[in-house]
Amino acid sequence: MSGWPRIYYKLLNLPLSILVKSKSIPAEPAQELGLDTSRPIMYVLPYNSKADLLTLRAQCLAHDLPDPLEPLEIDGALLPRYVFIHGGPRVFTYYTPKEESVKLFHDYLDLHRSNPALDVQMVPVSVMFGRAPGREKGEDNPPLRMLNGVQKFFAISWLGRDSFVRFSPSVSLRRMADEHGTDKIIAQKLARVARMHFARQRLAAVGPRLPARQDLFNKLLASKVIARAVEDEARSKKISHEKAQQNAIALMEEIAANFSYEMIRLTDRILGFTWNRLYQGINVHNAERVRQLAHDGHEIVYVPCHRSHMDYLLLSYVLYHQGLVPPHIAAGINLNFWPAGPIFRRLGAFFIRRTFKGNKLYSTVFREYLGELFSRGYSVEYFVEGGRSRTGRLLDPKTGTLSMTIQAMLRGGTRPITLVPIYIGYEHVMEVGTYAKELRGATKEKESLPQMLKGLSKLRNLGQGYVNFGEPMPLMTYLNQHVPEWRESIDPIEAIRPAWLTPTVNSIAADLMVRINNAGAANAMNLCCTALLASRQRSLTREQLTEQLDCYLDLMRNVPYSTDSTVPAASAGELIAHALQMNKFEVEKDTIGDIIILPREQAVLMTYYRNNIAHMLIMPSLMAAIITQHRRISRDALQQHVEALYPMLKAELFLRWEREELASVIDALASEMQRQGLITLQDDELHINPAHSRTLQLLAAGARETLQRYAITFWLLSANPSINRSTLEKESRTVAQRLSVLHGINAPEFFDKAVFSSLVLTLRDEGYISDTGDAEPAETMKIYQMLADLITSDVRLTIESATQGE
């Protein structure tokens, strides 16, 4: 580029460099989209805009991509490196020819015909200044749509710092030429497909237009389902129809979001400023699969795990910066206090009560509102656990909202609904101290402005944050596979509850929990906490801690928990240095070296972070515990031990493997443990390697408390085979509390009611407990003897004496 065009672009770039601060989606386009910079790259933009072109250029130069203003020279021909699909509007409307883009596509394709070695990468790029969807009434032309020069100037002036450059996966023109030819008809088809691509991308970025809130309420009131519920309300409560209708409107006011793009923009600025000061980084993985779902027109339901109140803001912030529409979020009614409630409502929150029981009108209004969100095409987010995890483990799912999601499908008319499980991880959770108090029996504090300000005042260095998108679950595909007759239940008016609904919802919920855990994120804090809590004195030398982290990292890297889980790329030493900056540990120096200590008052709190990745290490920990206690064991015996205990572990930690997969998992982990020198293989027997016995013992300690808990319940069941489930749960907790006091077990979940409730249900499902009294006590005693061999003799004596003394 030379002469007047260079001067023109330089002059135009002066105001843009001041007004525009764009972000790239994805953050590293060359790496994440697999662009090969050694091969020719050309860019395709939706419509003619020099401002868009220069904004793209700034991002290309920042990410070491070819300059779009520098032409491509191929076989002596000079071609522009960018193509505008549409001429774009002007201040005065007139016909703008589209032939130029078709001609350029044809020129590029023709070069591929004459040069078989040529392969140009065509990269679609859209530049967005603002992403307001507009209202259903009022705005004819939301800012993202094609703007003429004057409109563009004002859009850039107002929205220049809320701009995104969205790179899409490249298209190989070589493949296009080989498969479809190089004539002008193919070039026209390519331009047409590109236009459709950009139209879909706009919808994915901004979402459908927003309704006026009152119009939405009027539509809901006019629905036959709510009209019938209003009549039932009037009849059952002996009130007038008008009063019952006012009750319905009041419930809509309580529930409904009041989405505001301006509030999104303002919050984005505040959160961007806040995250940069509180977090050292927010790590996002597998976002491209969600962008593709949005592009393909799926109705997306985000289903994250729930660690903290921060989840609401973090996930919306991440999605916005991934070029996706922030979802409508189901938030607990406890958050509907001033000023948080009105703010959350404008950020897309709709509020849900803890229980729907005894209020048919409320459940009907909520279900119809949720169905309306789906039918209008808004993405939705809800926490399937129902509340924040106090232990750091996934809670058993609450299936009410998920059931309503499937009922919305049974009304017909919605786009394909896809559930997206999300793992959210932190190196510091601001509520973790409160969680520990609640697990010890303290009453949960009601959310309020003073409590919120108190929490915010304590925010300091929060380390790293992690948002991992798991494997999506297309509901239609799932139902086609598991309930082929589901379409027979479609009813556009009534909320149907077919016989298959409850078991199917339970199965989907369990699958979602497994997929959330599959996307787990190991980090410096949870790895260091796992190692230090494994030590009985909660302290290790720096060398021992480094060796233990190396063991964990090698296990996770060489035998990954799943393809969606993430492990830090940093070394053990770097992770320890980072964890020490979080000020959770103490370092005691002596003449020999450093000792890293987890203080007693921090130990209970740090179990939360250990539990975040307990599922990722439980299998090697269990194997290490079995090998350590037996000193040597055959592969077959090891597998028998693991298979006997696996159903309880799978249910408690939502593990991913089926029973028939265990043999290959055990073999892979045993091979890795042998490679690390933790064990040796002699005559098909696994032996402890004395040189690395400490590392193996610390690895085994990860399963220690779980095995002790199982031993308690199996001993009680062995001692009293006719015990009922409720009593078994209660007595198991009592013994666990006694054990924790006598043996210094600092994990609050050790005697958590939910953990024992889940265990007892699994024992019933596995046949160890029977409501009809036909359980097999001999099998129960056999499992107890196996567990008794895996725990220390003093713990075993405490368990057995607890029942003997009663």
Swiss-Prot record:
Range of residues in the leader sequence: none
Protein name, UniProt field: Glycerol-3-phosphate acyltransferase
Entry keywords, A to Z: Acyltransferase, Cell inner membrane, Cell membrane, Lipid biosynthesis, Lipid metabolism, Membrane, Phospholipid biosynthesis, Phospholipid metabolism, Transferase
Catalytic activity: sn-glycerol 3-phosphate + an acyl-CoA = a 1-acyl-sn-glycero-3-phosphate + CoA
MF annotations from Gene Ontology: glycerol-3-phosphate O-acyltransferase activity
Lineage per the UniProt record: Bacteria, Pseudomonadati, Pseudomonadota, Gammaproteobacteria, Enterobacterales
Cross-referenced HAMAP family: Glyc3P_acyltrans
Assigned GO CC terms: plasma membrane
Family affiliation: Belongs to the GPAT/DAPAT family.
Originating organism: Salmonella schwarzengrund (strain CVM19633)
Gene Ontology annotations of biological process type: CDP-diacylglycerol biosynthetic process; fatty acid metabolic process
Chief place where the protein resides: membrane
Database matches in InterPro entries: GPAT/DHAPAT, GPAT/DHAPAT_C, GPAT/DHAPAT_LPLAT, GPAT_PlsB, Plipid/glycerol_acylTrfase
Entry EC number(s): 2.3.1.15
Annotated pathway: Phospholipid metabolism; CDP-diacylglycerol biosynthesis; CDP-diacylglycerol from sn-glycerol 3-phosphate: step 1/3
Topology of this chain in the membrane: Peripheral membrane protein
UniProt free text on domains: The HXXXXD motif is essential for acyltransferase activity and may constitute the binding site for the phosphate moiety of the glycerol-3-phosphate.
Name of the gene this protein is made from: plsB
Residue ranges of the motif HXXXXD motif: 305-310
SUPFAM superfamilies (UniProt xref): Glycerol-3-phosphate (1)-acyltransferase
Compartment(s) of residence: Cell inner membrane
